[in-house]
Amino acid sequence: MSKEVNEERTPRTVADVKEMLTKHSNGEIQRTIQNCITVLQNDHVLADAIRLNLLSERIDIVKTVGWPRSGKTLNDTDMKYILRRMEKYGISSEKKIESAIHIVANENRYHPIRDYLNGLKWDGTKRIAHVLHHFLGAAEDEYTCEAMKIFLLGAIKRVLQPGCKFETMLCLVGGQGVGKSTFFRLLAVKDEWFSDDLRRLDDDNVYRKLQGHWIIEMSEMIATANAKSIEEIKSFLSKQKETYKVPYETHPADRLRQCVFAGTTNRQDFLPRDRTGNRRFIPVPVDAELAEVHILDNEEESRTYIDQLWAEAMTIYNSGSYKLAFSPAMQEALQSHQQDFMQEDAQAGMIYAFLEDYTGDRVCSKQLYAEALGNTNIPAEWETRAICEIMNTGISRGDIQGWQAHKTAKRYPKYGVQKGWERVISPETGAEDFSEITDAEAK
C-alpha cells in the first residue's frame, strides 16, 4: 500500500535533516542509499514531492518545488535540480540518488484515475441512459443505454482491475461537427488521460502510446481496414497486457492494460462484413440536429455532467450488479445495428455468382480465389481463410444451398491436395476432374 503523503510534516531545515543522516566516525555524512532516502523524505523542498504514478507507470513530481517546470513527469532537468539539492547534504552519487528516488516513489505510489473515481459522489440523477442523446443526438432507447453502460463500466474496471478482459469498442457514427471526438476527450476527464494518436497497429511504439491513457480513440481505423487488418484490430482489442520497458527500467515487463478503445467514423458502411462476427464493435448512430446541447456550448457544465455520469457508473460498479456484455434480449438489437453499418461484401457476392453457374461437383478455396475472384497470384493464408469463412458461413446461413464441406482432402488438378466443399446432390457433371486420395496422401 502507498504511504499517505498528505500528513502534516514539521518543516525541517537542512541542518535538521543532516542530524538525521548516518555518518562516518570522522563525522562525514555517509553516501548511502538510505541517507538519500532520508533527505528525499524530509528535506522541505523534496518531501512528499516524488510519487509513482500507477497509470503512466512513471515517476511524478506532484508539488511545487524550487525550480521552474511544466507537467508532472520527472524529467532530466528535474534530476539535475535534485542532484544539486542533494549536494547540500554532501551527497553526490547520481546512481544512489536515482535508486533512492525509485524507492521513495514506489513507497508513495498513487493512481490519479482511481483517486478521481473514488472521490465522486452521485447525486442520484440517472444520466447513462440519456448522455448520448443529450450531447450527440443518439436514440434514447435501451440499446443505446446498454452500449454506454457497458463502455463506462469497462473503463472503470480496466483501471480498478488492470488487465481485465474487455474487448468491446463503442463506435460513434455520424457526420463531422457532431462532437464525437470531443465527447470521448471530455469523457476521459483530463486531456492527458485521452489519446487519439493511435494510427497504426504495426508501429513499434504502439504499446507506449497506450501508456498513461484511459480512453483511446481509433478514428476511421475500422472503416479503412481490409480483411487482414480487421483481424489485427480484433486481436489487438482482445489483448489484456503488453510487454515492454518503461523509462528508468532496464528489463521489459508485463504491463496490464488500463485503457479502453473508442471508435469514431463519418462512414455509414464502416464495419467490415466479418464472417466470424463483429461482436467487439458496438455502433451507435449520432445526429447533431437531435442533440439537446453541443458538448462545447458550455464546457464547464458538460464536465460537471460527465463527473456525475462517472459517479453513477461507479455506483453500479460498486454494487456488483452488472455485466460487460449485452443482455440476451439486446443481442438481436446489436446485430441489427451492426448490419446497418456493414460494408457490402463484394467477395461473397462474386463467389455466390460463380457457384450459381458452376457445374463441377467440388470446389476449393484456391480455385475460388482464382476463378471466382479473378486473381492470378498465390493467395495469402488470410485470403484463403476469408474465402473459407464466406463459404462456411454462407452454407450455415442458407445463403449457399446444395453444398457442404467435404470430410477429407481431395486432389484438384490445378490446385493440388485441398480441403473444400462438395455438392450435396451432384448434377452428374465434372466428377471426373477430381480424385479421392488416401489418408497418407492427405498428410
What is each PLM-predicted segment?
Residues 1-127, 142, 146, 377-382, ...:
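N-terminal nucleic-acid engagement/recognition segments and initiation subdomains in replication
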Residues 79-83, 134-138, 179-185, 199-200, ...:
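Generic detector of short, locally flexible boundary/turn motifs and exposed helical patches
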Residues 45, 49-54, 58-61, 66, ...:
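Residue-level preference for alpha-helix termini and adjacent loops
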Residues 101-211, 366, 373:
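P-loop NTPase catalytic core of nucleic-acid-dependent motor ATPases
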Residues 88-111, 165, 192-196, 202-237, ...:
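Feature primarily recognizes SF3-like P-loop helicase cores of small DNA viruses
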Residues 5, 14-17, 39, 45, ...:
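Extended aliphatic helical segments
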